[in-house]
From Swiss-Prot:
GO terms for molecular function: mRNA binding; RNA binding; zinc ion binding. InterPro entries: CSD, CSP_DNA-bd, Lin-28_RNA-binding, Lin-28A-like_Znf-CCHC_2, NA-bd_OB-fold, Znf_CCHC, Znf_CCHC_sf. One of its GO terms (cellular component) is cytoplasm. Keywords: Metal-binding, Nucleus, Repeat, RNA-binding, RNA-mediated gene silencing, Zinc, Zinc-finger. The lineage of its organism: Eukaryota, Metazoa, Chordata, Craniata, Vertebrata. Zn(2+) 1 binds at C132, C135, H140, C145. It is found in: Nucleus, Nucleolus. A zinc finger (CCHC-type) spans 130-147, 152-169. Zn(2+) 2 binds at C154, C157, H162, C167. Belongs to the lin-28 family. Residues 1-30, 172-252 are annotated as: Disordered. GO terms for biological process: miRNA catabolic process; pre-miRNA processing; RNA 3'-end processing. This is Protein lin-28 homolog B. The gene is lin28b.
Amino acid sequence: MAEGGAARGTREEQGKLPEQEEEEEEDPQVLLGSGHCKWFNVRMGFGFISMTSREGSPLENPVDVFVHQSKLYMDGFRSLKEGEPVEFTFKKSSKGFESLRVTGPGGNPCLGSERRPKAKTVQKRKPKGDRCYNCGGLDHHAKECNLPPQPKKCHYCQSTMHMVANCPHKIVPQHPTTSQGRYEAEPQPSTSSFQREGGGAFDYSSPSYSQEGRSELSERSSRSPQEASLSKISTSPEEQSRKGPSVQKKKK
């Protein structure tokens, strides 16, 4: 029984330990410090204090302490000026040192910074002049016009004889365009120059054939390869007699 009671006691003690640790974390030790404002962001509302004295004893190296605008003791817009002397209470947290209440020297209100956050500038459209589409007046709209419906006018010269699309006073530069809406390119010559090894250039143009030559080419291309081979084999005797002397000359 004694062993069982001892085990229960150890379990209860172990169960209380985390609770005690939480209570200690919730109630940290409040310390006193003094120093000056290192920097403060007026728009975001926070900054850091450079602590030079802790509990009345000076520090060799200044320590940074976080400060929020809600912890400042002052009236109006709460902020700190860079280099402003302050006194404060602070605590130690998992993120570092955080200030709890910040005042000026001797518990007086903080002076604060002269800077103010800039208001967001909303870009507004420029107000266009109101014009009546019926009579052209600038002090009312067409639905408020007292005149009866007026004839349509050219929006460029206010003439009733034509519309703005046919206005002779409005000059629109026109460029020649193709069917696809692109500008026509200047015609380029069909000749192409080739560079020689010696550095000169000569023009080469496509040969111009007559109608007879084109008909012969079309007939040749329409022939089958078998007909072409037969035409080579079946040559006339006149052609053979013509070729004969030339062959004899070559043999000599």
